[in-house]
Curated annotation (Swiss-Prot):
<dbReference type="Pfam" id="PF09330">
    <property type="entry name" value="Lact-deh-memb"/>
</dbReference>
<comment type="function">
    <text>Catalyzes the oxidation of D-lactate to pyruvate.</text>
</comment>
<dbReference type="Pfam" id="PF01565">
    <property type="entry name" value="FAD_binding_4"/>
</dbReference>
<keyword id="KW-0874">Quinone</keyword>
<dbReference type="InterPro" id="IPR016169">
    <property type="entry name" value="FAD-bd_PCMH_sub2"/>
</dbReference>
<dbReference type="GO" id="GO:0006089">
    <property type="term" value="P:lactate metabolic process"/>
</dbReference>
<dbReference type="InterPro" id="IPR016164">
    <property type="entry name" value="FAD-linked_Oxase-like_C"/>
</dbReference>
<feature type="binding site">
    <location>
        <begin position="70"/>
        <end position="74"/>
    </location>
    <ligand>
        <name>FAD</name>
    </ligand>
</feature>
<dbReference type="GO" id="GO:0071949">
    <property type="term" value="F:FAD binding"/>
</dbReference>
<keyword id="KW-0997">Cell inner membrane</keyword>
<feature type="domain" description="FAD-binding PCMH-type">
    <location>
        <begin position="36"/>
        <end position="207"/>
    </location>
</feature>
<dbReference type="GO" id="GO:0102029">
    <property type="term" value="F:D-lactate dehydrogenase (quinone) activity"/>
</dbReference>
<dbReference type="GO" id="GO:0055085">
    <property type="term" value="P:transmembrane transport"/>
</dbReference>
<feature type="binding site">
    <location>
        <position position="154"/>
    </location>
    <ligand>
        <name>FAD</name>
    </ligand>
</feature>
<dbReference type="GO" id="GO:0022904">
    <property type="term" value="P:respiratory electron transport chain"/>
</dbReference>
<keyword id="KW-0285">Flavoprotein</keyword>
<dbReference type="GO" id="GO:0031234">
    <property type="term" value="C:extrinsic component of cytoplasmic side of plasma membrane"/>
</dbReference>
């Protein structure tokens, strides 16, 4: 069957407005937020679950590769093509039009459709005094709920662990090339795919149709796991087979139509403590004591190094300001606008590369100072910063412990944040990742590339702060260290000097991490940046025996039936 026939059939399903074949207009869908870009025959944007199913069926019949994509906010290029060396044509299915969030069991659980975002879920749950698995970080840039599940996304919240569920509705292509719809949501929705998908979309089910004994809606064991600080393995990482279950961790090897998740009580009272020190052992002691001895685990414990603080202060200022003034729901629209501006800029040779970044960086120079003086004072005094958020009884636990541990000032300092300092500290921490990208765009003549590593250290690793050998360090302009300290998950961004082979540099760094017993990636998943470990490759092969959904992920083969 011809390409023209395929495009015609897809157009019949969604209408001409929602199929894009012009390469200049598909670029935003074919390019990752940080990494990955490649060709695609078309980008298709279904509005319903049934349209989604029919599109996948047509793609299977035409023997084309399917890459399912939601918000496309991943940092490792896992929901876009990567290069043009595939053995079949590619269709990208963007599911953001299929939004829908259904609260069940008195809002203690939720059904999320492919286009639902963490930000939307957070807003829907607030009136019920509940919140989703992740509420900061990925939620700020419009990440989808299902994208988080498919990638076992981690996030900042210590008490909840990686995004995980055992309840999902998905399509799987079996070894015979037959597409099967599997309803493991635990809800009686009918027998045929048409019945199941339509009934779910229109919420045509009753309380009696919902089973309560059909699996976990989050990782129930992580709270205990993260407290085991003497263990010689990481608390969480993407290749951990204990957290691979159907849709959970599938990385696009299934077409996921819905997931059923647990929600969590919203903390009525919280407090944030800002800690600064010049001794890494001080932060190790704090982490160990809080995880082992506190009755209540921290809500979050975010680390930021002074250099990352500086880069974010200068190159993340406008992102910080937009979130503070308008809220996170504006960011997806702004990212879309940014893509369109850059696309237009490429058409005119007299306009600079990275037009939107350069414009916004100029604008940011006229934005008033955004960080409180207290944060700047700690930046000037201390190299290492830890932002700890506590709730309930944990607030008093933290107050008493920090007052006794940092009593004389020899170990460092701390203060309990007021409302302005709390917001500023949190937003500043999450501006770091985008700030590195901005730095690369502004200094393109000096920067070869960013090597961005997502690392899970051993729970018992005392030497958590990296010291690079001179032969590596000499090739780097700046190193940005930040992460989820209580979980020992670190994001390490290296801005590489112009002229150096950044891929070779990354290879050398990964070898150093191997010697330390670290795992990578920790929570961003392999995408097209990391090589999938054997257990992860096995999981992908089991889910997608014909290798038709998102082939090449984790640097695996892109060929049909996993041919090498």
């Amino acid at each position: 069957m011809s390409v023209q026939q395929l495009i015609s059939r897809l157009t019949d399903i969604v209408g001409s407005r929602y199929i894009i074949t012009d390469p200049t207009k598909t670029e935003a869908y074919r390019s990752g937020y940080r990494f990955g870009t490649g060709n695609a025959l078309a980008v298709v944007r279904p509005a319903t679950l049934l349209e989604f199913w029919n599109i996948v069926k047509v793609c299977v019949e035409h023997d084309v590769i399917v890459i399912n994509q939601a918000a496309n906010t991943g940092l490792t290029g896992g929901s876009t093509p990567d290069g043009n060396d595939y053995d079949r044509d590619i269709v990208v299915i963007n599911t953001m039009r299929i939004d829908g969030i259904q609260l069940i069991n008195n809002a203690s659980q939720v059904i999320c459709l492919p286009g639902s975002t963490l930000n939307e879920l957070e807003n829907q749950l607030k009136p019920f005094g509940r919140e989703p698995h992740s509420v900061i970080g990925s939620s700020c840039i419009g990440a989808s709920v299902i994208g988080g599940i498919c990638n076992n996304s981690g996030g900042a919240l210590v008490q909840r662990g990686p995004a995980y569920t055992e309840m999902a509705l998905y399509a799987q292509l079996n070894e015979k090339g037959e597409l099967e719809l599997k309803n493991h949501l635990g809800i009686d929705l009918g027998e045929t795919p048409e019945e199941i998908l339509t009934n779910l979309q229109e919420k045509r089910y009753q309380v009696k149709d919902i089973r309560q004994d059909c699996g976990h809606g989050h990782d129930h064991y992580y709270c205990n796991y993260v407290r085991q600080v003497d263990e010689g393995s990481p608390a969480r990482f993407n290749a951990d087979p204990a957290r691979h279950y159907e849709a959970s961790g599938c990385a696009g090897k299934l077409a996921v139509f819905a997931v059923r998740l647990d929600t969590f009580p919203l903390e009525k009272e919280t407090a944030v403590f800002y800690i600064g020190t010049n001794q890494t052992s001080v932060l190790s002691d704090i982490r160990r004591h809080m995880l082992v001895n506190f009755e209540v685990l921290p809500i979050s414990g975010e680390y930021i190094h002074r250099d990352a603080f500086d880069i974010a202060a200068k190159y993340g200022k406008d992102t910080f300001w937009v979130i503070k003034k308008f809220g996170t729901h504006w960011l997806p629209k702004l990212f879309s606008l940014k893509s369109n501006v850059d696309r237009i800029g490429k058409k005119f040779f007299f306009l600079p590369q990275h037009l939107s970044d350069k414009f916004m960086q100029t604008v940011s120079k006229f934005i008033p100072e955004h960080l409180p003086q207290s944060l700047w004072d700690y930046r000037n005094k201390y190299e290492h910063h830890l932002i700890i958020k506590m709730g309930g009884k944990g607030i008093q636990e933290a107050r008493e412990y920090l007052e006794s541990y940092i009593a004389d000032g020899s170990k460092g300092g701390y203060f309990e944040c007021n409302a302005i300092e709390t917001q500023a500290a949190m937003l500043h921490r999450f501006a770091v990742a985008s700030a590195a990208i901005r730095y690369r765009a502004i200094h393109e003549k000096e920067v070869e590339e960013i090597v961005a590593l997502d690392v899970a250290l051993r729970r018992n690793d005392q030497d958590w702060f990296e010291v690079l050998p001179p032969e590596i360090d000499n090739r780097i302009i700046s190193k940005l260290y930040y992460g989820h300290f209580m979980c020992h998950v670190f994001h390490q961004d290296y801005i590489v000097k112009k002229g150096y082979d950044y891929e070779e540099l990354e290879y050398e760094m990964l070898k150093l991490l191997d010697k330390r017993g670290a795992q990578y990636p920790a929570e961003h998943n392999v995408g097209h940046l990391y090589e999938a470990k054997p257990t992860l490759r096995k999981f992908y092969k089991e889910l997608d025996p014909t290798n038709s959904f998102n082939p090449g992920i984790g640097k695996t083969t892109r060929k049909k039936y996993w041919a090498e």
